[in-house]
Amino acid sequence: MPRYKLTIEYDGAPFCGWQLQETLPSVQGVLEAAVQATCGVPTRVHGSGRTDAGVHATGQVAHCDIDKEFRPDKLRDALNAHLRPNPVAVLDAQIVPDTFEARFSARKRHYRYRIVNRRSNLALEVGRVWRVPQRLDSDAMHVAAQRLIGKHDFTTFRDTECQAKSPEKTLDQLDVVRDGDAVTIITSARSYLHSQVRSMVGSLVWVGQGRWSADDLAAALAARRRAACGVVAPPEGLYLVQVDY
């Protein structure tokens, strides 16, 4: 039975998240419906990670086993035909060894968080960025962000309902880059805790607003208490952009 690796993009706004829910629309649910419509039997689609409600992806990766061999480009096109009109697209399909696991074979996950830093309302990117009207000191945010690099107990930046066995994670990259009104937070790690990226971003925004210093951010990390976290950034600015294998 061939195993296929799928690279997927989606607008997370209409979904309860990646994970299948019986009564709510999910990205996994519409993908599994498209696979079933293509191959004729119910088929589980396994993602590299469970993005939350409202979180987007330009490079989510999934795998599925289909009891029929398709040319990868034909499978991609068939799935896209059945995905319409949902805001989900299969960008690429590949046949991979049956040892490939979208989640467990992943070596690194790359996220970007997009902020528009201006007083004017959003006209074109509603639901795709976080508008922060107060001027942000992006240089201070970047300097503070480096205090989170490395292996730490990230309990402060972990959702209280996170089911991970350990709060320890190793953060490989956390950069803050400004281009005009656009402030982008770029982060890479092998894996993250539930809501970790949005919690870090929200706390960095406090630094950018002058409410916290870099030392305050480091103290919040060291506190290892969820209550020490700053604001949690909203989901609409977050994108899963790439998964490395």
UniProtKB/Swiss-Prot annotation:
Superkingdom classification of source: Bacteria
Uppermost EC category: isomerase
Catalytic activity: uridine(38/39/40) in tRNA = pseudouridine(38/39/40) in tRNA
GO biological process, one term: tRNA pseudouridine synthesis
Active-site residue numbers: D52 (nucleophile)
InterPro entries hit by this protein: PsdUridine_synth_cat_dom_sf, PsdUridine_synth_TruA, PsdUridine_synth_TruA_a/b_dom, PsdUridine_synth_TruA_C, TruA/RsuA/RluB/E/F_N
Pfam families from the UniProt entry: PseudoU_synth_1
EC id: 5.4.99.12
Keyword tRNA processing: yes
Molecular function GO terms recorded: RNA binding; tRNA pseudouridine(38-40) synthase activity
Keywords: Isomerase, tRNA processing
Residues given in the record as substrate binding sites: Y111
Subunit structure: Homodimer.
NCBIfam families: hisT_truA (TIGR00071)
Family indicated by similarity: Belongs to the tRNA pseudouridine synthase TruA family.
Function: Formation of pseudouridine at positions 38, 39 and 40 in the anticodon stem and loop of transfer RNAs.
Name the UniProt record assigns to this protein: tRNA pseudouridine synthase A
Gene: truA
